[in-house]
From Swiss-Prot:
Protein name: Small ribosomal subunit protein uS4
Domain S4 RNA-binding: 98-158
Gene Ontology annotations for the cellular component aspect, listed alphabetically: small ribosomal subunit
GO MF term list: rRNA binding; structural constituent of ribosome
Keyword rRNA-binding in annotation: yes
Family: Belongs to the universal ribosomal protein uS4 family.
Assembly mode: Part of the 30S ribosomal subunit. Contacts protein S5. The interaction surface between S4 and S5 is involved in control of translational fidelity.
InterPro entries: Ribosomal_uS4 (IPR022801), Ribosomal_uS4_bac-type (IPR005709), Ribosomal_uS4_N (IPR001912), S4_RNA-bd (IPR002942), S4_RNA-bd_sf (IPR036986)
């Protein structure tokens, strides 16, 4: 299966902001953005002015990297969002937030989205009591997400849940940290998601 093998800290520096790709490290002063807040490479500190197309492309790449999806998956998500009722950009963000790997990450079952994705692929997550090993599976309001019994004793998962609890869970999730189980109450509203994401630039890029 195709994967993005670029170093995660390098991806954050390329976008000029924290994408939270490396779990707990991103919340410490060891984060690469804290130490070298400029683009990687020989000319990283001499960033030139981007064209309108360049700005749109950078925003798309940033969004793809945040959610860890490849171009084909992202394009398919845009096309689905465009067919749905409502605002296309908000629909796209909701589709990304409803992915099983993202929901598992938000519930603290993985320190990062990539770690949560790996746990899903290894049959470590149940949805309504059924094993689902497809990271892109779309979680629906009312679905119950739970760490599989065999994975509940993994120290990394325990540590991730504890750290997520300290940072507080999103309003659209209800999580029982002791049972390692949570309910996806509803899809997040646009106001619930980071304002640093400008999804309208992505829609402008794809609609050309």
């Amino acid at each position: 299966m195709a994967r993005n093998l670029d170093p995660k800290c390098r991806q954050c520096r390329r976008e000029g902001e924290k994408l939270f790709l490396k779990g707990e490290k991103c919340f410490t002063d060891k984060c690469a953005i804290e130490r070298r807040n400029y683009a990687p490479g020989q000319h990283g500190q001499k960033s030139g002015r981007l064209s309108d197309y360049g700005v749109q492309l950078r925003e798309k790449q940033k969004l793809r990297r945040i959610y860890g999806v490849l171009e084909r998956q992202f394009r398919n998500g845009y096309e689905l969002a465009e067919r749905q009722r409502g605002v296309t950009g908000e629909n796209l963000l909701q589709l990304l937030e409803c992915r099983l790997d993202t929901v598992s990450y938000r519930m603290g079952f993985g320190a990062s989205r990539s770690e949560a994705r790996q746990i899903v692929r290894h049959n470590g997550i149940l949805v309504n009591g059924r094993r689902i090993n497809i990271p892109s599976y779309q979680v629906k309001p009312g679905d119950v997400i739970e760490v599989a019994e065999k994975a509940k004793n993994h120290l990394r998962i325990k540590a991730s849940v504890e750290a997520a609890e300290q940072r507080h869970f999103p309003e659209w999730l209800e999580v029982d940290t002791k049972a390692m189980k949570g309910t996806f109450k509803n899809k997040p509203e646009r106001s619930d998601l980071p304002s640093s994401i400008n999804e309208s630039l992505v829609i402008e890029l794809y609609s050309k």
